[in-house]
């Protein structure tokens, strides 16, 4: 990814690569906040399970010399949304590269039990649920995440999400 002096993304010159987006103005001077164009969605039928996103600190990925990954954590048993992988570029940096097969991030799950990953199609209904959760801070600002979790449970959103997931499983 390459940017001009105004922080605007310069279109790639090749067809290889992954989409990215400058999602919002950075909070720090002369640093670009970049959202990587690959999102992950995790959800569980368990009551509660923390999912944590961190940088791949054991791998010494070259991109870590020029940017910092924004960590994230939420309860995938109480909330349904895509995980955005975001990078804060170092001050003044106008070019950011991640090489093929280079570790992007780590996902951790707060359990000692084995986890079974099951693929599902993200249909329009699931997209609406995910967008509602991920944008809730804009239409319901200053409400703590714990309160959002409670509302998610009270409105039986979990059952609606699980029903849609079960109807849209991808064969292995």
Residue ranges and their predicted role:
Residues 1-172:
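DUTPase catalytic domain/fold
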């Amino acid at each position: 990814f390459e940017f001009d002096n105004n922080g605007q993304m310069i279109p790639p010159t090749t067809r290889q690569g992954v989409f990215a987006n400058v999602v919002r103005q950075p909070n720090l001077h002369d640093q670009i906040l970049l959202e990587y164009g690959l999102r992950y969605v995790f959800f569980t039928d368990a009551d509660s399970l923390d999912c944590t996103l961190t940088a791949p600190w054991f791998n010494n990925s070259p991109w870590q010399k020029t940017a910092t990954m924004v960590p994230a954590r939420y309860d995938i048993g109480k909330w349904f949304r895509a995980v955005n992988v975001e990078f804060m570029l170092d001050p003044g940096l106008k070019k950011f590269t991640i090489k093929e097969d280079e570790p992007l991030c780590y996902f951790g799950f707060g359990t000692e039990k084995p986890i079974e990953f099951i693929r599902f199609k993200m249909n329009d209904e699931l997209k609406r649920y995910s967008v509602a959760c991920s944008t809730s801070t804009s239409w319901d600002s200053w409400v703590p995440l714990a309160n959002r979790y409670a509302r998610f449970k009270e409105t039986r959103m979990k059952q609606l999400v699980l029903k849609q997931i079960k109807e849209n499983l991808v064969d292995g």
